């Protein structure tokens, strides 16, 4: 259950986070182990483990998350571009089972990442 993850604890303010954005649907905070000068996680407040669990009823929420990433990127001054990543499941490298979008930027990012 994604309510019991570290992200659920951040949403409930049980543990601290460097929050950069919040609205009724989502929360965004700086990653504690950044992989780029700007590394922010955007998460829904609604508990969804990953994209495998997303349904058509989540369509508006998923769109909202992406537009929130765009707004935060602008707020952070990422005018030259940025990367968004959603890891899904063990084979996709997901370690926290609460859907989240990584926003990475502030430097040139190589491909493939690893």
From Swiss-Prot:
**InterPro entries from the UniProt entry:** Histidine_triad_CS, Histidine_triad_HIT, HIT-like, HIT-like_sf
One GO MF term = catalytic activity
Q: What region holds the HIT domain?
A: 6-114
Q: Give the residue interval(s) assigned to the motif Histidine triad motif.
A: 98-102
Q: Tell me which Pfam families the record gives.
A: HIT
- Tell me which domain of life the UniProt entry assigns to the organism this sequence originates from: Bacteria
Q: What is this protein called?
A: Uncharacterized HIT-like protein Synpcc7942_1390
